């Protein structure tokens, strides 16, 4: 491994992302594909870029990311969390700014399980009075 490479693990819902950061010119590679190829939705791309834009490092760092599990928004959130952790490893002074924006905290919300006798997690079968 290169000496000037920084690592962060991010998780969100059922997705997990491994993020490697090194000085470069702003190239983002996710599972051997570019950011534009991997995420069709602009909202997901924005979520991924948020921590980099906050600390003005979009053009200064190259990112190599592998992400598994979950759907589009979960993967985007996991990547954002991983980038945030890698940035903190890169420069600890960024922690306060990232924390204020809410990127450091792991979003612990998970899908609630379906219960027996109900149609979904909380949706009850229709009630008929007569």
Swiss-Prot record:
Q: Does the keyword RNA-binding apply?
A: no
- Keywords, in A-Z order: Ribonucleoprotein, Ribosomal protein
Does the keyword Cell inner membrane belong to this entry? Answer: no
**GO terms of molecular function:** RNA binding; structural constituent of ribosome
Give a Pfam family name: Ribosomal_S9
Enumerate the InterPro entries for this protein.
Answer: Ribosomal_Su5_D2-typ_SF, Ribosomal_uS9, Ribosomal_uS9_bac/plastid, Ribosomal_uS9_CS, Ribsml_uS5_D2-typ_fold_subgr
Q: Name one GO biological process term.
A: translation
Q: Which GO terms describe its cellular component?
A: cytosolic small ribosomal subunit
Describe the subunit structure: Binds ObgE/YhbZ (AC Q8ZLS5).
Q: Which family does it belong to?
A: Belongs to the universal ribosomal protein uS9 family.
Q: What is this protein called?
A: Small ribosomal subunit protein uS9
The lineage, from the top, is: Bacteria, Pseudomonadati, Pseudomonadota, Gammaproteobacteria, Enterobacterales
- Source gene? rpsI
């Amino acid at each position: 491994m290169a000496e000037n490479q920084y690592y962060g693990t991010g998780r969100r819902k059922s997705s997990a992302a491994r993020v490697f950061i090194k000085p470069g010119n702003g190239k983002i590679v996710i599972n051997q594909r570019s950011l534009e190829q991997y995420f069709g939705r602009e909202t997901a791309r924005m979520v991924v870029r948020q921590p980099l834009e906050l600390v003005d490092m979009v053009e200064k760092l190259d990112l190599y990311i592998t992400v598994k599990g979950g759907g589009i928004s979960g993967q985007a959130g996991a990547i954002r969390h991983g980038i945030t952790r890698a940035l903190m490893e890169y420069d600890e002074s960024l922690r306060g700014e990232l924390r204020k924006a809410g990127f450091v905290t792991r979003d612990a919300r998970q899908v609630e399980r379906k219960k027996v006798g109900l149609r979904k997690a909380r949706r009850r079968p229709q009630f008929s009075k007569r």
